[in-house]
A protein has these predicted regions:
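C-terminal motif of bacterial Sec signal peptides marking the signal peptidase cleavage site
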Residues: 18-21
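An extracytoplasmic/periplasmic, membrane-proximal ligand-sensing/linker region
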Residues: 23-24, 33-43, 48-59, 239-307
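Short helices/loops that flank or line small-molecule/ion binding pockets
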Residues: 81-95, 108-109, 142-143, 187-208
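A ligand-binding cleft/hinge motif common to bilobed small-molecule-binding domains
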Residues: 96-108, 163, 168-169, 194-197, ...
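Small-molecule pocket liners
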Residues: 126-130, 234-240
Length: 307
């Protein structure tokens, strides 16, 4: 009798595993195709400490491998301003682009936006902030005359394009002549630290990084003040090269969009720092294109390297 019960138990467990595998294949019909030999190289723009950022994306790598059998290799880009060259030179398949680098890559390389994350607070957009130290005496564009401005990179929206538009709206058409100096810090986090440490009088960065640092470092709220913010822009999107296998694109998109529907996906999202993913496309970047036109930037020919 004991042996009979053991046999029945084994059969039940085996059946459950088989049904689970069938359900998984039915839920993700693209698994019927073998993706095991596929390797994708995805670039990551520099927003935070490189080790923290890499750890952030490793959980997503594991999930995609478990669900689709695809090996996704992430590579950290040292600067925003070299993504187009590295994309081509290293035969990248895609990237998690911020709004400006996406617009550049879309216009110069033809990449296609796929999905973007939804933050834990339910937002899928960000804003640009312009900020100063509270003790700087600066509260308007007029008071920025002769002051030092820290930008992120020439290839950023919140960290360069938006502040250029802000200055132009306030009658400042030649920032280098008006300001007391400018420099490119390389990342939003570095800009914030530069203003905190009085290496710059004014800074510009995206609100997501600013708010994250404010939650970790009480000095941000205590010592800095935000002067103005931009309209909303899409969060960093996953965009892939145009000629990538359409079935593979579809599989990736469906898997990311459906993550919140299964337990492993929910846990991966929690560790990734997102509630889920939503669809995105080029139409979501209308505000960025307006800013570019406002300051006279042609994205097809823009020289985005820092000088």
């Amino acid at each position: 009798m004991a042996r009979y019960r053991t046999t029945i138990s084994v059969l039940i467990v085996t059946a459950a595993l088989f049904i689970g595998a069938c359900d998984r294949t039915n839920q993700f019909p693209e698994l019927k195709k073998t993706w095991g030999q596929q390797e994708l190289l995805i670039g990551l723009i520099p927003e935070q400490d490189v080790f923290r950022q890499r750890e952030h994306y490793m959980v997503l790598k594991k999930y995609l491998y478990d669900r689709l059998g695809i090996t996704v290799n992430f590579t950290n880009l040292s600067r925003y301003g070299n993504i187009v060259e590295r994309f081509t030179a290293e035969n990248m398949d895609g990237g998690f682009f911020d709004s400006f680098t996406y617009a550049l890559a879309h216009n110069q390389l033809g990449v296609e936006a796929l999905v973007r994350p939804v933050n834990l607070d339910g937002t899928s957009t960000y804003r640009g902030y312009i900020f100063v130290r509270k003790d700087s005496g600066i509260r308007t564009a007029a008071e920025m005359k002769g002051k030092r401005f820290a930008f992120v990179e020439r290839a950023t929206t919140a960290g360069y394009l938006f502040p250029l538009a802000y200055l132009r709206e306030n009658g400042i058409t030649d920032p280098p002549a008006y300001l007391g100096g400018t420099f490119f810090a390389g990342s939003p986090e570095a800009v914030i630290q530069a203003v905190l440490n009085k290496e710059a009088d004014i800074g510009a960065a995206k609100n997501t990084i600013y708010d994250l640092l404010a939650a970790e470092n009480p000095r941000v709220e205590k010592e800095l003040v935000i002067l103005t913010s931009s309209s909303v822009l899409p969060l960093n999107c996953l965009a892939l090269r145009r000629d990538l296998d359409p079935e593979l694109k579809s599989a990736l998109k469906k898997t990311l969009l459906d993550m919140e529907k299964d337990r492993n996906g929910t846990e991966t999202l929690r560790r990734f720092g997102a509630r889920g993913f939503i669809e995105t496309d080029n139409r979501d970047y209308e505000y960025l294109y307006r800013l570019s036109a406002q300051v006279g930037i042609d994205l097809k020919t823009y020289r985005y390297k820092n000088e």
